[in-house]
Amino acid sequence: MRGLLTVPAPAQAAAGAGAFDPDRGWRLHAQVAVRPEPFGALLYHFGTRKLSFLKNRTILAVVRSLADHPDVRSACRAAGVDDSEHAPYLHALSVLAGSHMLVPQEADQ
């Protein structure tokens, strides 16, 4: 399977308390804009000036619904991603969290 996300600049993995945990709730950072495209979407973070590409509409559906679910796996299931297919989605979401596109649901806005 091809990757689900393209990040132009190297994204560093989140560390410490901010490390990506798919068993907790996540949401888009308040400074991130989503622009749907035929291939998926563009994400732009106005604070860091980073641009990320979501390579299909399924990952876009997951990202958009994160705030509506108690954890990442629930958001994946709601978007129609089978449990056996979660790995590439979790990886893409981890990269987005590492680049501060996603933040924990309980994080300050």
From Swiss-Prot:
- Annotated disulfide bonds: none
Please give the superkingdom of this protein's source: Bacteria
InterPro entries from the UniProt entry: MftB
Tell me its family: Belongs to the peptide chaperone MftB family.
Q: How does it assemble?
A: Interacts with MftA and MftC.
Task: Describe the task this protein carries out.
Answer: Peptide chaperone involved in the biosynthesis of the enzyme cofactor mycofactocin (MFT). Binds MftA and MftC with high affinity, and is essential for MftC activity on MftA, likely via the formation of a ternary complex.
Name of this chain's protein: Peptide chaperone MftB
Organism classification, top ranks? Answer: Bacteria, Bacillati, Actinomycetota, Actinomycetes, Mycobacteriales
Protein's gene: mftB
